[in-house]
């Protein structure tokens, strides 16, 4: 007989109906009810006990656990990122892991199909957040906030095919920094790019490049090349793939799959394969076709100003004007940017290789207005750091160089060589904790000294305090350096001060 706790809801409903039949019910009713219960039980598809043993314990596809060693690496990365955000005056903010489905729909273009939808018994249609930008815009509109500089570190979810080796998952962290409010052009945008440079330099990931463009320039290119306005989004998503596939393949997609005329695709190719610095911006100002488009001229004007500010910030050499940059998300309205790591070429004449995007962002002046009942806009610009991609790179380097990672921050271990000293150890470690010293002890009444010392060596704990019968009589504590194995006797009342002194010097 199957366990009652495993009965499906339908079987319970029918069974309760059988146990409480209506007054005067005929026997034939009971017979039919028996039959219905049997059908419901068979429909439950309960697996036999022997099949249950085949169940594989694992994490869902596209997710993973992080070991203590991995958590240390991640926390160090997040410390660098968040410290930079705070250095630039950002306030912390958090939003729910899931939003009303209506909040997220029609904000991500072709990527909208990657949103996780939830079933809710309360009747609301819900979805897991796809990024941290749309919830931020909803927060601004809902709370009537007109100016804010905020950072947010949190998980997001996407139903894409995960590629673990490339650091892509279905559940992952994002670290966002955004500036909301009406300000003079390009000053907040330049600060966002400066922040990108500070973070990537601080993480010591190697050489990097920030590609920058403007959605207005891209739309202007499409217009002067003859792309129908109804195809702008579709062609934009194709151009956005140029960092992954060749122009030949992108052109094929435009013409064959999206119905663009071959000559129009060729004209687009003349533009989107260009990249350079401020000189390319000046060149585009002189372009006979692009210079006739108002949108493109506005975008080029802002980029020229942006490069002036980046020069003052001392980071202009890290930024390249790249006309192939598209950023497929629908909510971008102006400047867009993306940071990529560069692999040093084998030969001097070769160009650096693109190892993939590790940060991205842009301006989205219309997103908040989508949530405001009166359509009031709050201009915004921001960036997102790709923590998972960075984590994968750092983790691989640690494995390559065989670096050892400490999984705890313990500074002192309280040890004893003798039996029946648990009470003294507990008093001593409480004193260390109260003084703000990170300390551990072994959870045994009578531990042996050698395993305690081995534990300190394995965990990288720098100091050991040793208390025994002789030390207790003399009113001292032995302080041992794990690295040098040198021991000194310290007066009991001076122990905390001596430990703090040594830790400050290390």
Curated annotation (Swiss-Prot):
It is an enzyme of class 6 (ligase). Pfam families: HGTP_anticodon, tRNA-synt_His. Its EC number is 6.1.1.21. CDD domains: HisRS-like_core (cd00773), HisRS_anticodon (cd00859). Keywords: Acetylation, Aminoacyl-tRNA synthetase, ATP-binding, Ligase, Mitochondrion, Nucleotide-binding, Phosphoprotein, Protein biosynthesis, Transit peptide. One of its GO terms (molecular function) is identical protein binding. Belongs to the class-II aminoacyl-tRNA synthetase family. This is Histidine--tRNA ligase, mitochondrial. It comes from Bos taurus (Bovine).
């Amino acid at each position: 007989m199957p366990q009652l706790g495993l009965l499906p809801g339908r079987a319970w409903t029918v069974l309760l109906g059988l146990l409480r039949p209506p007054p005067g019910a005929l026997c034939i009713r009971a017979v039919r009810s028996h039959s219905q219960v049997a059908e419901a039980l068979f429909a439950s598809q309960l697996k036999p006990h022997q099949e249950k043993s085949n169940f594989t314990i694992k994490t869902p596809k596209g997710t993973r656990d992080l070991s203590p060693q991995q958590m240390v690496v991640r926390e160090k990365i997040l410390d660098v990122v968040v410290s930079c955000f705070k250095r630039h005056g950002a306030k912390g903010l958090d939003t729910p892991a899931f939003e009303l489905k209506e909040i997220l729909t029609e904000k991500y273009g072709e990527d909208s199909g990657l949103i996780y939808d939830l079933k809710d018994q309360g009747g609301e249609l819900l979805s897991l957040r796809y990024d941290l930008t749309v919830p931020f815009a909803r927060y601004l509109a809902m709370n009537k906030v007109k100016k804010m500089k905020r950072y947010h570190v949190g998980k997001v979810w996407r139903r894409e095919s995960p590629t673990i080796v490339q650091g892509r998952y279905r559940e992952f962290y994002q670290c966002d920094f955004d500036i909301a409010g009406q300000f003079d052009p390009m000053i907040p945008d330049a600060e966002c790019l400066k922040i990108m440079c500070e973070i990537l330099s601080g993480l010591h990931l190697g050489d990097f490049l920030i590609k920058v463009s403007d959605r207005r320039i891209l739309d202007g290119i499409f217009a002067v090349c003859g792309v129908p306005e109804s195809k702008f989004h579709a062609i934009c998503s194709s151009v956005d793939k140029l960092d992954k596939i060749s122009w030949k393949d992108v052109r094929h997609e435009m013409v064959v799959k999206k119905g663009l005329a071959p000559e129009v695709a060729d004209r687009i190719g003349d533009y989107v394969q260009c990249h350079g610095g401020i000189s390319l911006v000046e060149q585009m100002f002189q372009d006979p076709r692009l210079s006739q488009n108002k949108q493109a001229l506005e975008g080029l004007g802002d980029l020229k100003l942006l490069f002036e500010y980046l020069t003052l910030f001392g980071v202009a050499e890290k930024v390249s004007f790249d006309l192939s940059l598209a950023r497929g998300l629908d909510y971008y309205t102006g400047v867009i940017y993306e940071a990529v790591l560069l692999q040093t070429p084998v030969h001097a004449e070769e160009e650096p290789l693109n190892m993939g995007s590790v940060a991205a962002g842009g301006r989205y002046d219309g997103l908040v207005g989508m949530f405001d009942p009166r359509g009031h806009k709050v201009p915004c610009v921001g960036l997102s750091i790709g923590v998972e991609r960075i984590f994968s790179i750092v983790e691989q380097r640690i494995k390559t160089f065989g670096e050892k990672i400490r999984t705890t921050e313990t500074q002192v271990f309280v040890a004893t060589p003798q039996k029946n000293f648990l009470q003294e150890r507990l008093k001593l470690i409480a004193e260390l904790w109260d003084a703000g010293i990170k300390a551990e002890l072994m959870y045994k009444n009578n531990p042996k000294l050698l395993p305690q010392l081995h534990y300190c060596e394995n965990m990288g704990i720098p100091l050991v305090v040793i208390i025994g019968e002789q030390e207790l009589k003399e009113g001292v504590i032995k302080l041992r350096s794990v690295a040098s194995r040198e021991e000194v006797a310290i007066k009991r009342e001076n122990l905390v001060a001596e430990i703090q002194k040594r830790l400050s010097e290390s």
